[in-house]
């Protein structure tokens, strides 16, 4: 059966002592020749010793208006069975129910600790984040877990109706006594309890989250990881995902201006820009800005910026930005990096180079997404059409949007979301200061603000494995539910034919719950998942 939310996953010594005492009382009542009154007293004492906390939990559930919670169902069955005279069987049922709940809780705890070991305590923030989610059942909730819980609840309600009809009508149509029909009905109600179905659901999700976290992929909410399983469109922002996430200025070549003045002009020119080179220039400058000098700012995605600084017209950008203008630029140098030229009042004043190295970890990213069944792979970039097309063809993207500023990127994502029935995933590194219209926002960065999933830059090649994990979360959750529902069906069949009693129903249902919990570990089993190897 299910562990209750209030119970700790560790070994409860007091509970074990109570169960031992209840077992002794049960054994004494069955083995020794006692009067009926004394036997009844001993069995009642065994029930109270083993399960008084079930009554307390049932009261709390009723106060929360959760009338079909496991403690409420068990308390009802216990009371009805005692009233019907099944004292020894009821005592055995309560002992086994409590023991089964303790074993399930302990199994959940051990599985979660094993999953956490995949992260390693050296990653303190990630470890603490996932540890907190283990104690937060809502944080581990997914669409499939909610659906299965709802289905289990419906089965319980339907089972109660059928059990009541069976108890009332069958004696009228057959030779069964009401005592026998009530007994079989109680077994049906007990086994329809939702506990064993939901016991493994959070374990499956948390195991998957820990597996991903061990690969540098941290989820802010479990539903985001689950949503990856239904990815139809993957949208990639080139900057920071495929290119260097932290570009640097590698060369400064001023003309007419001294170096400090040139850098000051460049920093002010790039201050309001959302393009990746702007941060590199800001890092080089490192001084106070005089923003009142900046006017008429225009951010030209993929090319550069145009503005006025102190009333002087300034153009700062790639060579393509100066096409058709009167300013004459020197020929490209043989140095490395992307070159940005600057003119002030129509005069060329120098250039600087920004590193533009590729992120080796993303070399096979598009291919691996395609291997996971994602056919629509779209590239968003600030760069010009010609340069972007070459890169998109090399990486085999199926769609391209070039010269996109942040607003254009957000519009592209919004349009794709409205035109797609499946899920849209947006993978970016910087420049977006809000949640987009994508179903899942994945940020390649050390900071997770506005992202559903955070990927550490050096682990971006592991991202496709998160899709594999998401699919396994869904499939294993379904398998676990199938296991427990199948056991319930067998027990109900046995109950209807008179071959199952209360304690046997609890024993079989608890065994199914434990099996489902241990099966959850398959989410992270390397033998069942495609392995993505990082290029060193």
Predicted features, each with a name:
Residues 43-85, 89-119, 126, 140-238, ...:
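Hydrophobic alpha-helical transmembrane segments
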Residues 1-4, 116-132, 158, 222-266, ...:
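Conserved cytosolic catalytic loops of P-type ATPases
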Residues 193-195, 232, 238-239, 244-245, ...:
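Active-site-proximal glycine-rich helix-loop-beta segment
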Residues 249, 253-375, 385, 397-415, ...:
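P-type ATPase nucleotide-binding
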Residues 1-38, 114, 124-140, 528-536:
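Flexible metal-binding regulatory segments at protein termini and peripheral loops
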Residues 117, 124, 129-132, 136-140, ...:
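Conserved ATP-binding TGD loop and adjacent catalytic N/P-domain core of P-type ATPases
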């Amino acid at each position: 059966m299910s562990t209750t939310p209030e119970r700790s996953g560790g070994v409860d010594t007091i509970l074990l002592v109570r169960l031992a005492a209840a077992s002794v009382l049960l054994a004494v009542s069955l083995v020794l020749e006692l009067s009926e009154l004394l036997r009844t007293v001993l069995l009642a004492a065994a029930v109270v010793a083993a399960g008084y906390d079930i009554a307390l939990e049932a009261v709390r559930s009723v106060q929360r208006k959760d009338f079909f919670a496991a403690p409420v169902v068990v308390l009802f069955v216990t009371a009805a069975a005692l009233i019907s005279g099944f004292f020894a069987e009821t005592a055995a049922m309560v002992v086994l129910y409590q023991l089964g709940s303790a074993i399930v809780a302990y199994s959940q705890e051990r599985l979660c600790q094993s999953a956490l070991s995949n992260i390693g305590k050296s990653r303190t923030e990630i470890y603490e984040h996932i540890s907190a989610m283990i104690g937060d059942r809502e944080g581990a909730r997914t669409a499939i877990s909610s659906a299965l819980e709802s289905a289990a609840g419906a089965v319980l309600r339907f089972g109660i109706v059928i059990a009541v009809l069976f108890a009332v009508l069958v004696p009228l149509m057959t030779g069964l006594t009401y005592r026998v029909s009530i007994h079989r009905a109680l077994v049906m109600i007990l086994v329809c309890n939702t506990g064993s179905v939901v016991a493994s659901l959070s374990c499956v999700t948390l195991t998957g989250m820990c597996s991903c976290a061990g690969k540098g992929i941290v989820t802010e909410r479990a539903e985001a990881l689950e949503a990856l399983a239904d990815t139809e469109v993957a949208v990639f922002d080139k900057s920071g995902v495929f290119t260097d996430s932290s570009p640097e200025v590698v060369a400064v070549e001023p003309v007419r201006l001294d170096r400090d003045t040139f850098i000051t002009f460049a920093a002010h020119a790039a201050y309001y820009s959302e393009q990746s080179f702007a941060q590199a220039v800001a890092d080089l400058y490192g001084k106070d800005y005089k923003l009142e000098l900046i006017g008429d700012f225009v951010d030209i995605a993929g090319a550069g910026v145009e503005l006025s600084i102190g009333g002087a017209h300034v153009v700062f950008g790639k060579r393509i930005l100066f096409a058709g203008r009167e300013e004459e630029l020197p020929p490209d140098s043989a140095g490395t990096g992307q070159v940005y030229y600057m003119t002030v009042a129509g005069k060329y004043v120098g250039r600087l180079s920004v590193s533009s190295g590729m992120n080796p970890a993303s070399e096979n990213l598009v291919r691996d997404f395609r291997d996971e069944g994602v056919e629509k792979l779209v590239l968003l970039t600030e760069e010009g059409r010609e340069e972007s097309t070459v890169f998109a063809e090399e990486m085999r993207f199926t769609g391209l949007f070039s010269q996109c500023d942040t607003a254009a990127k957000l519009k592209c994502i919004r349009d794709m979301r409205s035109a797609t029935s499946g899920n849209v995933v947006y993978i970016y590194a910087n420049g977006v200061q809000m949640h987009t219209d994508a179903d899942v926002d994945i940020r390649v960065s050390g900071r997770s603000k506005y992202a559903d999933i955070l990927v550490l830059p050096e682990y971006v090649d592991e991202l496709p494995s998160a899709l594999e994990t998401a699919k396994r979360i869904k499939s294993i959750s379904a398998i676990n539910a199938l296991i427990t529902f199948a056991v319930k069906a067998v027990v109900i069949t046995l109950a209807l034919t008179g071959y199952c009693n209360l304690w046997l129903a609890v024993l079989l249902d608890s065994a199914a719950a434990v099996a489902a919990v241990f099966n959850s570990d398959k989410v992270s089993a390397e033998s069942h998942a495609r392995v993505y190897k990082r290029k060193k």
